């Protein structure tokens, strides 16, 4: 039994330990010795929709919303949804998928609507502050997301994937609070005392609602490079993905700006059989580049140094993965990120200023 997403009364600043204990990434970060639940959802499938030859499925719960295409290629696993170029976080919500090939005539086409709640504003029970689960006007409002995933074509070798989503009431630190905290932190660092420590505690910023954001992704993937050129190329995978983000700030500003800012990112990758035995091993090379105001929601990406896909600058990765059993794999990876701007892995307020 849990709230959808994080809760509005969850130590709002998340300054210790950073964002690591936020609900979107609670299973991607080692925070304490408790066991977390990553996925638990209800799934219903049926072959016909109101008598029409349209297979469909619906699900509700803590859905598999991390490790989507194409990050799953590096991880050597089946893709979840949505596309991981823009969204790779744990999320509580719903989805409805329609297989549209029989309707449109486009090979392998399907369409999915996804929605969820990333933060729930509700007073807890038995806290003596008012009606249980009532809205708390002193806390952040609900964070919601709604979007779609569409595959207009997939013949098993070549496929096109598209993703659009909007998220409302995203959180971050406002500029004034962040500046006050930085000033207090500087004073404490220069002259530690009970007085400067108290001032630092008072200046600890809290997350505020800073605005909305739009995400869009278009991805092309080929499983097999060419046709019959060689067995090696037939067993290789290549992809190219383009994504964009567009902020819609309120008066507190997003990413350090009160204007709507657009960011873009390109992501290219290739995955091929490792020429060194065993046959189950794969090697890969990936490169991505993000612009000044690029902002992805990829906090759940499994890397040591934050999300490489969020990089405002360029990132390279070389990796090798090997299946040990059907359920266990072993991987080695080298990631290099060259930042052109600050704020790549922050949330959506002044802490994300480039």
Where are these regions (language model features)?
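Outer membrane beta-barrel
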Residues: 1-129, 143-162, 265-299
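Outer-membrane beta-barrel pore domains
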Residues: 176-354
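Outer-membrane beta-barrel transmembrane strands
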Residues: 30-37, 41-46, 56-61, 105, ...
């Amino acid at each position: 039994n849990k709230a959808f997403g994080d809760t509005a009364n969850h130590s709002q600043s998340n300054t210790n330990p950073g964002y690591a204990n936020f609900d979107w990434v609670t299973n991607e970060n080692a925070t304490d010795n408790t066991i977390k639940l990553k996925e638990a959802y209800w799934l219903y499938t049926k072959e016909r929709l109101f008598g029409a030859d349209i297979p469909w499925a619906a699900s509700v719960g803590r859905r598999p919303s991390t490790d989507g295409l194409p990050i799953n290629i590096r991880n050597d696993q089946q893709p979840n949804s949505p596309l991981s170029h823009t969204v790779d976080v744990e999320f509580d919500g719903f989805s409805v998928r329609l297989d549209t090939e029989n309707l449109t005539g486009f090979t392998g086409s399907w369409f999915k609507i996804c929605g969820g709640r990333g933060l729930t504003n509700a007073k807890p029970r038995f806290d003596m502050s008012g009606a249980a689960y009532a809205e708390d006007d002193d806390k952040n409002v609900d964070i919601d997301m709604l979007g779609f995933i569409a595959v207009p074509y997939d013949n098993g070798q070549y496929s096109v994937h598209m993703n659009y989503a909007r998220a409302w009431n995203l959180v971050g630190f406002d500029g004034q609070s962040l500046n006050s905290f930085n000033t207090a932190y500087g004073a404490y660092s220069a002259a530690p005392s009970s007085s400067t420590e108290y001032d630092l505690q008072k200046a600890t910023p809290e997350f505020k609602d800073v605005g909305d954001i739009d995400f869009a992704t278009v991805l092309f993937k080929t499983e097999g490079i060419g046709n019959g050129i060689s067995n090696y190329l037939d067993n290789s995978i290549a992809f190219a993905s383009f994504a964009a983000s567009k902020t819609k700030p309120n008066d507190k500003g997003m990413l350090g700006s009160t204007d709507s800012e657009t960011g873009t990112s390109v992501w290219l990758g290739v995955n091929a059989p490792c020429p060194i035995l065993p046959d189950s091993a794969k090697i890969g090379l990936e490169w991505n580049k993000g612009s000044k105001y690029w902002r992805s929601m990829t906090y759940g990406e499994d890397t040591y140094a934050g999300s490489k896909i969020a990089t405002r600058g360029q990132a390279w990765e070389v990796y090798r993965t090997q299946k040990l059993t059907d359920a266990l794999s072993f991987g080695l990876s080298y990631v290099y990120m060259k930042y052109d701007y600050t704020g790549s892995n922050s949330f959506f307020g002044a802490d994300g200023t480039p």
